[in-house]
Swiss-Prot record:
Gene that encodes the chain: ccmA
EC class of the enzyme, as a word: translocase
ABC transporter domain segment(s): 4-207
Binding site for ATP: G36, S37, N38, G39, A40, G41, K42, T43
Gene Ontology BP term (one): cytochrome complex assembly
Subunit and partners: The complex is composed of two ATP-binding proteins (CcmA) and two transmembrane proteins (CcmB).
Source species, domain of life: Bacteria
Any single Gene Ontology cellular-component annotation: plasma membrane
Species: Shigella flexneri
Keyword Transcription regulation: no
The name this protein goes by in its record: Cytochrome c biogenesis ATP-binding export protein CcmA
Family label: Belongs to the ABC transporter superfamily. CcmA exporter (TC 3.A.1.107) family.
Length: 207
């Protein structure tokens, strides 16, 4: 039994089948990229895996239990960062991290922002930051979270090359420690092919 399992998922949108019979099992330490053309359903699949949406058929299981039966405990193990940064624009970058990680002290939050490339921007209201900087505020959570499972939708959007490298290193560290990373990205990942598992939505099934 894997940590996270998708079993015979079917998803339809506007009378169009995005994917059907989609099954796969993920284990601790896996780093997975969901691939497919625009409109293939990558974001939709991520939302199914977070439990924010339900499939038209099939089910998603966490440690052998359907998500809807373990929703609360599952969400405690999950970090989800979608297309929108999901941050409070009236708060500063530092205040945002305190809001999401109340058990993190100031030093930890400052270090996370520095790791995300935001040293010197800690006390600036988020609504005064660029799109890329706002994205970095959300992604700074990767250096604070204790979640086992990270689901990230296009995390590298509006991030420069150095930022992408730093984030990639953090994801590698997380999987090496037994965590799971699932992401979509249009950017090539600068990691060994042996470290990445790809699940394609251009096919009806994934192993």
């Amino acid at each position: 039994m894997g940590m996270l399992e998708a079993r015979e998922l079917l998803c339809e949108r506007d009378e169009r089948t995005l994917f059907s019979g989609l099954s796969f099992t993920l284990n601790a330490g896996e780093w997975v990229q969901i691939t497919g053309s625009n409109g293939a359903g990558k974001t939709t699949l991520l939302r199914l895996l977070t439990g924010l949406s339900r499939p038209d058929a099939g089910e998603v299981l966490w440690q052998g239990q359907p998500l809807h039966q373990v929703r609360d405990s599952y969400h405690q193990t999950l970090l989800w960062i979608g297309h929108q940064p999901g941050i409070k624009t009236r708060l500063t970058a530092l205040e945002n991290l305190h809001f999401y990680h109340r058990d993190g002290d100031a030093a930890q939050c400052l270090e996370a922002l520095a790791q995300a490339g935001l040293a010197g921007f800690e006390d600036i209201p988020v609504n005064q930051l660029s799109a890329g900087q706002q994205r970095r505020v959300a992604l700074a959570r990767l250096w604070l979270t204790r979640a086992t499972l990270w689901i990230l939708d296009e995390p590298f959007t509006a991030i420069d090359v150095n930022g992408v490298d730093r984030l990639t290193q953090r994801m590698a560290q997380h999987t090496e420690q037994g965590g799971i990373v699932i992401l979509t990205t249009h950017q090539p990942l600068n990691v060994a092919e042996s470290k990445i598992r790809r699940i394609s939505l251009t096919q009806t099934r994934a192993a």
